[in-house]
Amino acid sequence: MNMGKLKDIPKIDRPRERFLEKGADALSKSDLLAIVLGSGIQGKNVQELARQIIQKFGKGFLNITIDDLRKIAGIGHAKALQIIAAISLVKRFYQEGGSNGQTALLLSRKEENSFQLQNRRYIGNKYKLADWIFSILEKECSGNSFMDIFAGTGVVSARVATRFKGIILNDFLHSNHAVYKAFFDKGEWDREKTYHIIEEYNRINGKDLKDCYFSKNFGGKYFSRSSARIIGFVRDDIEKRKNDLTEKEYYVLITSLLYAVDKIANTVGHYDAYFKKVLVDDTFAMRSPVPIQVENVEIYREDANLLAKRIPADIVYIDPPYNSRQYSRFYHILETLVKWDKPKLYGTALKPAEENMSDYCRTTAKDKLAELVRDLNVKFLVVSYNNTYASKSSSSLNKITHDEIAGILAKKGATKVFEKDYRHFNAGNTNFNNHKEFLFVTKVK
């Protein structure tokens, strides 16, 4: 993937477009700085320039001066002033808030150093649609239990958590399962203990470490060599500590690592490829996950079609993959970090042998969905769908059509269809004119 020039990067992957689409939490510090800068300099696009600045000043960024910035080749007075003005504005609001005693506006040290559930990049993430989905559920469905059978990031379950007495999350990716365990599980854990371990990890200097499995394979590609050493060291250390950790503490540390990795990965948000001519962000920093408050929760990592045969619920939310993008392949590095089996890797993208390949990403998708719907023991089915079946990208072509879903659900009960204009992840070849997100709601007869 040669993306040395900003114009070579698909629009949806550029900082401004991603900010508008997914919000600030989906962007790294260098992405946010790129938006402030607006444009690059001779021979260096804005993302490369922003990464260079963040990498150079690191944690001292908020204390830089115009003279500091002018020492970077190509940075003129105007760009230096843009950055310093933005920093000064933030400091001014912070200081004024503190002097007026508005402590509610100022995050505590621990809150400031935390990860929210939605703070990661993920294809098909429903974070910006969660309120819309919830509003329809409130109006159209009733019951006490909610099953998110293809839970993905878990943001839909998080949004409805206060509405239901029981939440059931399922996803067959090891990395998503780990995230649910950290954010949703009600197991015992010592927050101070995990916080101090994370602080210990954040003090590590990658230059002091030897190369390891992770740095030898992914350093200088998906991550800087230094960050890759830290990632590998931390993952090894978490495993060494496992006997002294509760299950919840173990997954809190694993999830903190996964989210930290996502923030600095030299990619567009997945691991199907990496940028070959873009500077790698070298600001590795773990944070504590902020738990989701839920009354009762069950967490599974199973084939959805098998789980459907034995776990009942009042409402099931179904959001399977509809195209050929295999999530186990797109997020193979996160899967490896959770399993920590250090597999043999293949190809330019450095992927392990195939595992957890979904039938919903194949021509069998329609039959698998029909089987799932038939076997579910629920009162209401809620199905998300988007119209990328008109895509020019082969990987985005839907394996199931709108009409096929409607036909499958009609056999189960009366169905209503809701729609909303919404733009999804795009590799640059899809025409998003009139693009919509659909929500099917079926009351089982």
Where do the protein language model's features map onto the residues?
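Class I S-adenosyl-L-methionine
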Residues: 399-445
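S-adenosyl-L-methionine
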Residues: 105-147, 155-162, 186
